[in-house]
Amino acid sequence: MIKLKVKKGDEVIVITGKYKGKKGKILKVFPEQNKIVVSGINLVKKHTKPTKVSEGGIITKELPIDISNVAHVDPKTGNPTKVAFKFLEDGSKVRIAKKSGEIIGKEGK
C-alpha cells in the first residue's frame, strides 16, 4: 500500500473526469481502497423507502472517487500542486506545496 498524502479536511481540486476543475474539502479517506469522498463531488441521488425511523424520499450524497483523480490546492495560488514532506527545525514533519513551498498541514512528530 502506498503512503497517502491526503487527509480529512484538505482542500483538493479534481484534475480528471466529469467534475474536472471543481474544488472541495475531503470528508472521508479510504486508504485500503485508495479512494476519498470530496464535498460536492460525485453526487448521486438515492431513493429510500419510508421506515419507522425516517421518511422516504430522494437523498443526494457523495460517493468516493480515486485519489489519483485529485490534486492538492496550493494555499498561496489556488492552483493544483504536488506535495512533498519536509522536517522543520523542531523535528516536526510537515507537508509542503512543491510549487510555492507553503505548508499544507502538520503530520506530527
From Swiss-Prot:
Taxonomic placement: Bacteria, Pseudomonadati, Pseudomonadota, Alphaproteobacteria, Rickettsiales
Origin species: Rickettsia bellii (strain RML369-C)
One annotated GO molecular function: rRNA binding
Entry's Gene Ontology cellular component terms: ribonucleoprotein complex; ribosome
Protein name as it appears in the record: Large ribosomal subunit protein uL24
UniProt function note: One of two assembly initiator proteins, it binds directly to the 5'-end of the 23S rRNA, where it nucleates assembly of the 50S subunit. One of the proteins that surrounds the polypeptide exit tunnel on the outside of the subunit.
Subunit structure: Part of the 50S ribosomal subunit.
SUPFAM superfamilies tied to this protein: Translation proteins SH3-like domain
Keywords: Ribonucleoprotein, Ribosomal protein, RNA-binding, rRNA-binding
SMART domains associated with the record: KOW
Superkingdom, natural source: Bacteria
GO BP field: translation
Family: Belongs to the universal ribosomal protein uL24 family.
